[in-house]
């Protein structure tokens, strides 16, 4: 990170990863994160400081196994046991090629070099931008970052306590320096999930920082 007056820019080893800023996760969407759209101006400002930006996109087929509608008698936000472990059931959301799955129109990052789609396998959910929830199926992002020497990862987006959290944790486990820009995130909050995220991130050495530190 280099300073220009009081403003910081990021060089060849830094990358901003913008997680799932999609219509269905913003107000009015099928799985809206409270005040999720408030982070978009912050992320746009952050992105202008980075040469390298990656977007992620939840991209589910119809009838995905994480949808409550795929489990007769079950309701959204109940938990079931999948082959890979506990799975929260969600409202149908981010269905491929629908408006809800689209990146929010207010997100203005024309130099974003890559969109990583996740959750495309019908029987496996994906919170992390690096692996599906079976912990075996990679998205390809690890190789992309390593090939380009991108070692410092700054994460922002939706939702803090799920996809942002698990992405940051996997980044750290893979040997990257990971930071969450917390005021550029919003959480869902299910049964203490925000507090659990903070505890887990701290244990792995993932700092939660503030966008104003370098805007």
Language-model-detected regions and their locations in the chain:
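Short acidic-hydrophobic, aromatic-tinged amphipathic segments that line or gate anion-handling sites
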Residues: 207-215
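Short glycine-enriched, charge-decorated loop/helix-capping segments at active-site entrances
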Residues: 29-36, 129-133
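Short, hydrophobic/glycine-enriched beta-strand segments
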Residues: 14-21, 25
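Short, glycine/acidic-enriched loop or turn micro-motifs at the edges of active sites
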Residues: 23, 61, 121, 160, ...
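Short, flexible loop segments at boundaries between secondary-structure elements
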Residues: 179-194
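Histidine-anchored nucleotide/phosphate-binding helix
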Residues: 42-46, 164-175
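Active-site flanking residues adjacent to catalytic metal/cofactor-binding acidic residues
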Residues: 19, 57, 182
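Active-site alpha/beta core segments
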Residues: 41-152
């Amino acid at each position: 990170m280099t300073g220009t007056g009081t403003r910081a820019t990021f060089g060849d080893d830094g990358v901003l990863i913008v997680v799932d800023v999609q219509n269905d996760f913003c107000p009015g969407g099928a799985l809206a994160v409270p005040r999720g759209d408030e982070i978009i101006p912050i992320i746009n400002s952050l992105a202008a400081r980075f040469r390298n930006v990656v977007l992620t996109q939840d991209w589910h087929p119809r009838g995905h196994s994480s949808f409550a509608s795929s489990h007769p008698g079950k309701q959204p936000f109940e938990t079931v046991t999948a082959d890979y472990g506990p799975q929260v059931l969600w409202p149908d959301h981010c269905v491929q090629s629908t408006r809800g799955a689209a990146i929010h129109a207010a997100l203005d990052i024309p130099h974003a070099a890559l969109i990583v789609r996740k959750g495309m396998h019908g029987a496996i959910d994906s919170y992390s931008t690096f692996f599906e929830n079976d912990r075996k199926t990679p998205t390809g992002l690890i190789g992309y970052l390593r090939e380009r020497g991108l070692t410092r990862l700054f994460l922002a987006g939706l939702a803090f306590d799920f996809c942002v959290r698990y992405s940051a944790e996997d980044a750290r486990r893979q040997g990257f320096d990971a930071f969450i820009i917390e005021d550029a995130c919003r959480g869902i909050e299910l049964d203490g999930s925000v507090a659990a995220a903070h505890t887990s991130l701290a244990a792995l050495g993932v700092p939660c920082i503030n966008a104003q530190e370098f805007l």
